[in-house]
Amino acid sequence: MTKPARVPVSLVRLRTRDGVWLDGVIAEPRRRRRAALIWVHGLGSVFSSGQPLIQELSTRLNPAGIGYFKFNNRGHDVVAGRHLAGAAFERFGQSVEDIRAMIGFAVKCGYGRVILAGHSTGANKVLHYAARTRDRRVIGLVLLGPISDIAGEMKRIGGRELRRRVALAERIARRDPEALVPRAWGFWSARRYLSLYRPGEAEDVFPYYRPNARWAALRGVRVPVAAIVGSRDEYLDRRPAELIGAFERNATRARSFTGIVIPGARHGFQGGERALGRAMLRFIGYVCRRGVRVPAGRLTRGGGRRPRVRRGAATRRRRRHRSPSQPA
């Protein structure tokens, strides 16, 4: 029987400006506090999920002076009892208040600089937050498993069926936005279903499935960005390098772009925790040490070598890097 991972963390709680309480864990370095990594979990998850990854990241980051913070967001679990909450009834735009409160908590703990790391739907949220607020305390973004919910659902049920379901959800939402869609589709309110699966919604920040999409959120970000995906992510509808290439081409204002594929890892990075920990530590170390500059490198499969970097707008004319799979 596998022993549960022992994680040296403190249990904490914060309150958002609109009165929502969020539980979480933090693991802090003993000495100098260089920056904080705030991990934003995915759809319906909780702060305590993925304990092997919490242990891997905290034990790697803390000796480097990086604090590790992971909180529930108001979309944790499936549904709450006192009022309509949880993933089924979450409003994506309210994630801004959650992340703002998380950053404020880290600042009160003595961290003046923050890297936001979002996994799955958490990646949508941190990108949306950074593009909308341009919070100067945020010095970098890590997008982990940044898969479009729309692309993933089209892969699962087909584009025609998804369009039919969206049309029905629109009819339900006109009567009552909080009414549930058919149970076979999952446990969602009509409003939440449309937020997840209707193209052009605020949550649709990874529109690689749509030719000529604007990518407004990613193109509005100016801090260093890393996109990390598992080579066996079950929600991918294309090769991992193609996905990374789409992000690279649209991170037009980011100071730098790093794309990494973790070999053998699935969407939750199970079994790839060590490689992911190495990759994240390397990216965060560069960002913290140099502020916004990242050394040139190449796309890697795994976290032990130098990450692939595309320079920001200020230096792109002098040097560009392209993976062999990226179209010219």
Regions found by a protein language model. Give the residues of each.
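Cap/lid segment of the alpha/beta-hydrolase catalytic domain
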Residues: 74-90
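Alpha/beta-hydrolase active-site loop
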Residues: 86-108
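Primarily recognizes the serine-hydrolase "nucleophile elbow" in alpha/beta-hydrolase
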Residues: 105-168, 200
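Short beta-strand/loop motif that positions the catalytic acidic residue
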Residues: 221, 227-229
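Conserved alpha/beta-hydrolase "acid-adjacent" motif
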Residues: 234-243
